[in-house]
Amino acid sequence: MANRLTSGLLVLLTSHTPLLAAQTSSSRSDFERVQDSVAGVSDTVRLRALFRHSDDPVRAGVIGIRLGELGDDPDFSDAIGRFRRATRQHAKDAAPWFGLGLAQAKRSEWEMRDMLRMGSRVGLGTLEKSSNAYRHALGIDPTYVAAAIAMAQVDLSLLDTTRLRTARDLLRRTIALVPNAPHELLLVWGRVERASGSVQVAASAFERFLAGGGKRALGLLELARCRLALGQASGDAPYYEGAALDDPEAIAEYRADLQVIAPDSVLHEFDSLHGQWRAAFLHRFWTDRDHFDLRPEGERLREHYRRLLFARSHFPLTVSRRFYGPQDAFRSGSVEVDDRGIIYVRQGEPAERLRPFIFGAMPNESWRYNRAEGDLLLHFSSGYDGHGGGDLYDYRLVQSVLDLRGAEDAPRDQLILSRQTLSPIYSHMLNWGRFGSANEAARERHIGATSIWVSTTTDSHELQFRHRLGAVADLIAIGQSARGGLGHFVFGIAASGTTWQRTTAGVEYPVRVRLVALDRHDRAVATLDTSLVIQHDHALTEKEFLVGRVELPLPPGRWSYRAAIQEGDSGGVLLPPDTVLVAHNGEVAPALSDIAMGTPGRAVPWRTDAGDTVLLAPSALFREKSQVVIYYEVRGVRTGAGYRHQIAVLRPGREDGDQRPLVALSFEEVAASPVIRSRRVVRLDQLKHGSYIVEVRVSDPEGQQQVRRRVIHIIGN
């Protein structure tokens, strides 16, 4: 079979045909015909003979490319040489330039595979030459579709924004001159438009791609990428529609977009699903993140594609090889973006970004992220020093500002001084004594290492506020709702920093509360996003707190929860996560509710369905010598049976032992209904400043106990 194919090829290549310079269209078709003829030939001896005896440099160049693919000329130098000769002989013909671009692209691949070649940009220079050759071909013939597609693919891989803008302009000209642009051309045109920043034009290109009958799943994803990056909710529908189509090429693209933030367990589940099940899985994946970050549904998906586009535009990895050293604290393996891009896609825009110039140090940056559980501090350094390193265009994560490339050659005080706005720890490193400074330096390194671990293994879209408010809050599960339990989110906002509006009745404070309860998989079991107006007869002083309460129906169980409080247009706070235990309804056994605690004038009142007034404190802080009102409920008791109540205040850490209570109160009560509602006052007169445990035990006639505990902190007046 190979011999017959080669013989036919010999006839084709040795037949007398006009010179390629005759007409551009005919030379292009002749080029493609020869290219198709040699594609299936693997006899290098006959191909080499044809190459030597061919008097047409373009045809010889096509054969040379095939020889290179078969390993007979691995660096494609023969093909490049023949195509260069063809560009000189047929200067007004586009086909030789197209062939030269193909050969140089092949040579670039060979250079990148050669591990003996040193440097971080191996093969990229040749790839740029390939792109230039394609551009020359388009300069001669703007309708040369194959050259336009090849140029776009090369420039997309180079990640050079300047080259992409030029490629965009050339593609626009080709699109305008080709009446019925093929699907492949529309696809790469849209991708180049998006990569060069013209996202709206890219969306139009993909709409044309879909309207013309291009691959539907791929077209829907590309259209969704554009709309989502622009923050448009209209991108949701094509995203999920495309995910439900079992197109291998499109599904690989979906997976690549997901892989930058998803752990292996999520990717494994994604790989196992098909059709609508895959689309439903993606919807749940993104919606879970919306709920976790207290965002409206769909916002996390749009933010993800905005970040991807921004990272690829601003933090591209314009090297072909990455060499790591001992001070590289993280090895992403990415070939698309540097470590700044990795962090940006996962964590978003930093609250503060420093890019100082320090004499002796390589280019570097530091980012700070505001987080409810503790800020993240991240340092990036490019270049190299005596400890190794990479490239000036490859920013790497390092644990400490003292690990920046060239830090040993830079003034230490200038390195530290340049980061003072990020954290007080840098002032301590600079100004404290020898041992204090060393301890702070060790702490700064630990913070850096922890920040790298958190930021490279998680993703976040936490709410950010221009002005951070001082606030305390608590979620107390007591009472009943249609879902089982009732959670009371009680909050107190420090008046300093709040805004108010005057009314005829006094002043009012607008407050927005966002709250989510999560299971152990961080999936929402209940959410709340509500606004309320708190009225006062006068504006609060700086030492006062704005207090309020909202209700969240909760199913029985132990849940973690996250909450954000916003007051006015720009002030707010995201609170650290906490947990709440919601008692069951008592159908199987007695169930003890949460413990509500409060002092008159320093708590929010709640009126129960039985008409009782309960005081709910927004925090666990109580002043010394306070009289604390305690309220709890026991559901599922037997009417007429006696129950023993024990309320105690204990020292922390020993509440399970036989220690003597610091404060104790016990009593018997006969249940008058299936629900016991108990309200008692506990005096804290004898307790000093510090932390304590308030414990409530309720025993049934058989001696079975229900126990609840709460931590309180006693402070001075």
Predicted regions and their residues:
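Residue-level recognition of tetratricopeptide repeat
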Residues: 56-58, 93, 144, 181-182, ...
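Structural marker of alpha-solenoid helical repeat scaffolds
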Residues: 53, 89, 140, 177-178, ...
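Residues within mature, well-folded domains
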Residues: 158-159, 195-199, 215-487
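Intrinsically disordered, low-complexity terminal regions enriched in Ser/Thr/Pro/Gly
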Residues: 406-717
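Short coil/linker segments at helix-helix boundaries
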Residues: 65-88, 92, 102-136, 157-169, ...
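N-terminal leader/linker segments that initiate helical-solenoid repeat arrays
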Residues: 22-69, 73-77, 81
